[in-house]
């Protein structure tokens, strides 16, 4: 419901309009956006009321009703006030026969970016000129805000891309020949981030000359890459060493699993989870988990995250921001309330960035739904990680009865035992 508010008459009716009002439209800009498209190529929904669109009007996908309403309101200078909660359009279903709240309808026209300067008819009333100037100010402020959001999002993406390039070098490499990494998680956290496997400190010469399974070698590198990445988190220096241990034990497997899924999907264009050498995860002879659970069942368990990525076609940027969100998990058991608040504040910044990115690429109407579908992958990622840890515990009960390739007291064991 909305009421029409009579325009205020200003004493200075001779006040000159803004330069935007006087500026004529260049000849090259006379064509509307939809006229430049291929024949019959129209948007599906009106950005204002969500009914069927008939094309682009004032640079926005719109129906004939919203196009006419916006034009008439600007020319007449009418002002409408919503008598509800200013969210009437959010609460209605798409229905062309339903009467829309005029206050919310005009506000949505401005929000989605209808260009008032594209109205070809002259604004002749004083009220219309004042309304147009007000709309122009709002749109200018909105552009400034959008620019600030773009700068924030660009910075986030740039930082994550640089970090991803660094940790991928470590993730897809192996420990130098003749050495193994026997450091505990606590010891690893004492050093600055190291992304080159040849620079890893305190490596241990190999005492057992028996060859280790290549899957275990890459598993260690993948976990180590996730741990090294976590050292770059802004909150890392703000929480205690014990809190870091608790958090990283929980999230490092999540981070490494997501990196492996992204590698297979984005780099190798594969629908199967691959090791860096191209081997399919879980199909290597001699792998105890594969032998105990069965190769097919074990492979299916390992590929749940990849299948979730493929199902909704997660792009590279969405993956990086989503991983940043999930590795900053304030709800990990054992963290103090202060630690949770510190981690949550940083996590919210990345959640905001992901929402802005989805809106930027999928629009105001579809962006939030895309954001929700990405966040909905979280339970799948958590479940896969938990199942992997459960399988590890089961494998440990059998390892005493046969030779096992898992090095004792290593980072891998410490993470999987948590």
Swiss-Prot record:
Induction, as annotated: Transcription up-regulated in response to intestinal colonization by probiotic Lactobacillus fermentum strain JDFM216.
Keyword Transmembrane annotated: no
Stretches assigned to the NR LBD domain: 174-414
Keyword annotations: DNA-binding, Metal-binding, Nucleus, Receptor, Transcription, Transcription regulation, Zinc, Zinc-finger
An example Gene Ontology molecular-function term: nuclear receptor activity
Localisation per UniProt entry: Nucleus
InterPro entries (UniProt xref): HNF4-like_DBD, NHR-like_dom_sf, Nucl_hrmn_rcpt_lig-bd, Nuclear_hormone_rcpt_NR2, Nuclear_hrmn_rcpt, Znf_hrmn_rcpt, Znf_NHR/GATA
Biological role: Transcriptional regulator. Plays a role in modulation of lifespan and immunity.
Family: Belongs to the nuclear hormone receptor family.
Protein name: Nuclear hormone receptor family member nhr-209
Organism: Caenorhabditis elegans
């Amino acid at each position: 419901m909305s009421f029409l508010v009579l325009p205020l008459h200003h004493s200075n009716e001779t006040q000159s309009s803004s330069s935007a009002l006087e500026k004529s439209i260049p000849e090259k800009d006379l064509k509307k956006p939809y006229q430049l498209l291929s024949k019959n190529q129209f948007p599906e929904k009106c950005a204002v009321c969500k009914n069927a669109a008939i094309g682009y009007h004032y640079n926005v996908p719109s129906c004939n009703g919203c196009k006419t309403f916006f034009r008439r309101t600007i020319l007449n200078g009418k002002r409408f006030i919503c008598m509800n909660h200013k969210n009437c359009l959010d609460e209605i279903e798409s229905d062309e026969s339903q009467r829309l709240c005029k206050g919310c309808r005009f506000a949505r026209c401005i929000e989605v970016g209808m260009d008032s300067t594209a109205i070809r008819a002259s604004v002749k009333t004083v009220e219309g000129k004042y309304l147009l100037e007000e709309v122009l100010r709002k749109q200018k402020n909105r552009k400034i805000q959008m620019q600030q959001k773009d700068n924030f999002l660009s910075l986030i993406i740039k930082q994550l891309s640089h970090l991803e390039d660094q940790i991928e070098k470590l993730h897809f490499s192996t420990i130098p020949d003749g050495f193994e990494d026997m450091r505990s998680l606590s010891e690893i956290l004492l050093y600055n981030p190291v992304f080159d496997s040849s620079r890893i400190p305190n490596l241990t010469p190999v005492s057992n000359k028996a060859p280790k399974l290549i899957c275990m070698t890459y598993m260690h590198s993948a976990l180590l890459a996730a741990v090294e990445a976590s050292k770059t988190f802004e909150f890392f220096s703000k929480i205690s060493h014990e809190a870091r241990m608790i958090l990283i034990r929980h999230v490092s497997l999540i981070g490494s699993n997501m990196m492996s899924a992204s590698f297979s999907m984005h780099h190798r264009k594969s629908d199967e989870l691959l090791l860096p050498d191209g081997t399919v995860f879980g199909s290597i002879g001699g792998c105890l988990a594969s032998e105990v659970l069965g190769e097919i069942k074990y492979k299916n368990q390992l590929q749940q995250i990849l299948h979730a990525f493929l199902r909704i076609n997660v792009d590279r940027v969405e993956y990086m921001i989503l991983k940043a969100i999930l590795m900053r998990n304030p709800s990990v058991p054992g963290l103090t309330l202060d630690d949770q608040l510190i981690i949550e504040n940083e996590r919210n910044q990345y959640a905001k960035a992901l929402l802005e990115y989805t809106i930027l690429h999928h629009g105001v109407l579809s962006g939030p739904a895309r954001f929700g579908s990405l966040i909905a992958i979280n339970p799948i990622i958590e479940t896969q990680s938990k199942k992997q840890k459960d399988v590890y515990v089961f494998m440990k009960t059998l390892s005493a009865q046969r030779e096992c390739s898992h090095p004792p007291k290593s980072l891998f064991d410490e993470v999987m035992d948590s």
